[in-house]
Amino acid sequence: MYMRRGLLSIFLAAAIFFTAASDRAQQPAAPQSPQLANPAPPQGQEPPAQSPQKITTVVNLVDVLFTVLNRRNKLVPDLEKSDFKVFDDKNPQEIRYFSKQTDLPLRIGMLLDTSNSIRDRLKFEQEASTNFLFSVIRRGKDEAFVMTFDDEPQVIQSFTGDAGTLRDQIVKTRAGGGTAVYDAIYDACVKELSHPPRPPGDQPDVVRRVMILISDGEDNLSNHTRAEAIEMAQRTSVVIYTISTSTQWIQLSQTDPNKLANRKTHLTEGDEILQDLAEETGGRAFFPYHVDDLDQSFQDIGDELRNQYSIAYNPTNSVLDGRYHKIRIELPEHKGYQIRSRRGYFARANGDVNVKPAQAPTGKSNAP
């Protein structure tokens, strides 16, 4: 009898130890290794009960924020869960959570190219970035930081909600050196936007992570690749909006009477890179002629970021292989509507959330 009790005690102790070790194995990764998907349910939804099976389900949840525009490029705010279909690598998925995300606090990374190649457009960069911050930031709710990059990235102003403070640092920037665009994106995601300041007071702990990249897109010094920069933005749920500083268009437009209408037909290689960065992460690329051309665009960006939908699902293929998965969201009954979202995500790898994809997601997509 005593021997049986002793064996039972040993068995229970081993079981408790195994359960604790298993729980620790499911803890989030360290700050320098951001998770690919937000493990928490979307705002306004109840989390699942704390059973071992459902804990695993929450960890594998894929959460996608997206914007819907009508034929006139106006926001569509009144759609319901039943209107949408979501596909993971072309496989239909069951939508587990659906919500409308409105008036979210913004956490903005303003990335300014200060390399020698944009010397003639530095004033444009300063004016464009300052105008954006004053147009979009709401003091007490939104915050932004400023990072410059030439030979290497450098944060010149940490997160603040004061647009005037941000402007004061922006106007001090000077141009010179090479261009490390991809390193700047990667560092901004990992070091700043992966763990941005939480909203003050009793506001819900949900923020929108945004990057505004102003550059000619011509990288020549980065240690990271474009695929790695996009991967990190997708892992940290960062949406990239790009603004081109290309001067080739300005020279061409002097003999083109349809200068603004034809801008996208004359994209430089750098412009195409900027477009790819934006589209892969659910943002937009802008190719302005003058700073004034951006005024309405900035207002549109602010409206988009504060009026979005959220869909979450558990992938039917939940193998932890670190592989890149394409996401497609459809509106079967609204064929003329546009859906703007990130194009995919990286599945967790068994024991390593930072496994690189077998194929870089830098090509074009058939997503709406």
Where do the language-model regions lie?
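Bacterial N-terminal signal peptides that target proteins for export
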Residues: M1-F11
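Scaffold/interface architecture of coatomer-like assemblies
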Residues: D23-P368
